[in-house]
Amino acid sequence: MDLQHQTFHNKGCDIHYWHKSSSSADYVIFLHGAGCDHRMFASQLPIFGESYNVLLWDARGHGLSKLQHNQTFSFEDMIDDFLKLCEKYQIANAILIGQSMGGNLAQEILFRKPNLVSKLILIDCTRNTGKLTLSEKLMLKLSKPIFYCYPWQTLIRQSAEACGNDEAVKAYVRNCLAQMKKKDFIDVMMSLMTCLREDEAYRFPKPVLLLCGEDDRSGNIRKIVAPWADSDANCTLLMIEKAGHNANQDNPTAVNKAIASFLTTP
């Protein structure tokens, strides 16, 4: 796929993104997970051929979209980046495909701008509006000091092990994280908590495909995904065999088949 590498500046950060135009007005926008970059969706691009305009990015603080020395990652700034990108291309309706952090961002965009989204595909991400147990709330409060206790190389290695089953996926994650500073990674993880709000009455107003690796060991994702799907008539769940947290990389064949089928569903 012929992707054009471009940048735009917003809130002190040069955001790098990749764009492919088509004759269609339909857009699909890929949103990667924390610590990763746009390359994690390489195996999904062939699904879309010439039928869609495609956008991928390196979210601020990730990949080529480096933060300035005195900057701190903010989930709210990332939302603003996304909306600026949509404004730049006058996007009025898009399919969002988000993995982990990207899925949290996609949920928040649908919550705030429902008319901007036609469908969501959420890969191995937690529920923004889910109810947390007391132990989960405690772990969130303790996570920052725990992260800082870990040597950076140990944190990189353990994060990579949690993300993938396939050795190539683990190597990719290690490569991405090695380009970040420990403080920046921790800032990203802590900022993600700002999108969590308990609202058990909330239901998605658009069709949503939930994909989860059967071996996902990250947070509470595997535990909550089935009840999440059961509670929302707009959700369709598929567990992905032989896949960890980065299910779209561990088992792209199964993920691509599920996405292609979902795209044709009214």
Where does each model-flagged region fall?
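Catalytic histidine-centered segment of alpha/beta-hydrolase-like enzymes
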Residues: 243-252, 256
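Alpha/beta-hydrolase fold catalytic core
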Residues: 1-29, 51-52, 92, 260-266
